[in-house]
Structure formats: C-alpha cells, structure tokens
A protein has these predicted regions:
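A charged, aromatic-enriched C-terminal amphipathic alpha-helix characteristic of glycosyltransferases
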Residues: 91-122
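Short acidic active-site motifs
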Residues: 14-16, 78
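Active-site donor-binding acidic/aromatic loop of nucleotide-activated sugar
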Residues: 3-10
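Acidic donor-binding loop of glycosyltransferase active sites
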Residues: 21-34, 47
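Short alpha-helical segment that forms part of, or immediately flanks, the ligand-binding pocket
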Residues: 17, 39-44, 58
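Short hydrophobic beta-strand element within catalytic cores of glycosyltransferases
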Residues: 48-55
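Active-site donor-sugar recognition loop in glycosyltransferases
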Residues: 15, 30-35, 56
Length: 126
C-alpha cells in the first residue's frame, strides 16, 4: 500500500511524459555515473531520481551543497535498500524534489549550457 510501481515500456514520448507526472520517484540508469536526459527531465519536473549520481559527478560541476540523486549500484540488493530507505523516510521526498529542480536549473539550464560553449570557444579564438 505504501508504493505504487508504474513500469513503462514502448510508450510514445508524450504518453511517457504524462506517466511521469503521476510519479514522485524515477528509477533510471543503474550503470551511469551521472544523470542522463531522462533523469534530468524527471528532475526538472521535481521527481526524485534513483540512479547514477556518483560523488565525482557533483564534484565535476562544483555542486557542493545538494545531492538530489539517490545513487545506486547496479545491484538488486542496493536498489532495494535505497528504495526501501526512501519509503521508510518519505518525509525526505519534498526536499529531494526541490533539490532536483534546483540542480537542473543550476547545472543544466539550456541557456547556461549554451553560454558555456560560447565562452569556451571564444576563449580559444584569442
């Protein structure tokens, strides 16, 4: 009764996005060190991501104050333990949700990323 699992496969993207709106948590790539596009879209919507979020990925971005991704190993027991802990501590979800949105705004905003590319290449011209 505490958890409803929504498994999705082979959905058109619009339907998939609608399905995500009914969720609080997204279990994403287990073999990743960083969140990929699926996780980032979910985080931008305020979902809590359980997936790749290694400390090195935060360090690379200079992100020292928030850790919104629940990092898991590609191991059934680790995934279970991390999900169980989240269910047992549901009160953490609103804060992690807020941090997820904040993370995407800080580090994955399209205008900031585009400007970083422009700045990089302009610095190489001189």
């Amino acid at each position: 009764d505490e958890v409803q699992v929504v498994a999705v496969e082979n959905l058109p993207f619009d339907e998939y996005k609608r399905a995500m709106l009914s969720c609080d948590v997204l279990l994403d790539q287990l073999y990743s060190y960083t969140p990929a596009m699926n996780a980032l879209q979910a985080m931008a919507q305020g979902l809590v991501v359980v997936g790749g979020g290694e400390p090195e990925s935060y360090d690379l971005l200079g992100c020292a104050d928030i850790r919104p991704i629940i990092n898991v190993l590609p191991d059934e027991n680790d995934v279970y333990e991390k999900l169980r802990d989240l269910v047992d501590h549901k009160a953490r979800i609103p804060q992690l949700s807020h941090e997820s949105r904040l993370y995407t705004e800080r580090y994955h905003d399209h205008l900031k990323v585009a400007q970083a590319y422009v700045d990089f290449w302009q610095s190489r011209k001189n």
